[in-house]
């Protein structure tokens, strides 16, 4: 069963709550999942796994399909960093350099896909 689609209004409301500060955990979770959903729509595929624990993960970017074990191309970050880079408040390269994004694999650079336009 595919994950429940987050409607645009719900996603934007969650992003506004996070931007206002002190968002409750459910709003942060919705904001993260909404942005992951937008990324998956923008770059469909299965060659890179984008992880934002504990809220979600998606596989994106066309290329070799991964089926078992740890994918060869993985990006992992925390919720605050993901929201910042996905919305353009922080640059991908700055977050990687600071160690807030861990990207491994030849296809794991998502900078060309960001920021998203929620």
Predicted feature descriptions by range:
Residues 1-118:
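Feature captures hydrophobic
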């Amino acid at each position: 069963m595919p994950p429940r689609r987050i409607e645009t209004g719900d996603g934007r409301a969650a992003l506004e709550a996070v931007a206002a500060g002190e968002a409750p955990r459910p709003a942060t979770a919705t904001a993260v999942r909404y942005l992951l959903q937008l990324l998956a729509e923008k770059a469909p595929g299965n060659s890179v796994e984008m992880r934002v624990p504990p809220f979600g993960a998606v596989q994106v970017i066309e290329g070799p399909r991964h089926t078992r074990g740890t994918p060869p191309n993985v990006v992992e970050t925390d919720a605050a960093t993901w929201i910042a880079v996905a919305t353009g408040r922080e640059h991908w390269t700055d977050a990687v350099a600071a160690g807030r994004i861990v990207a491994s694999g030849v296809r794991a650079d998502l900078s060309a896909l960001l920021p998203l336009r929620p």
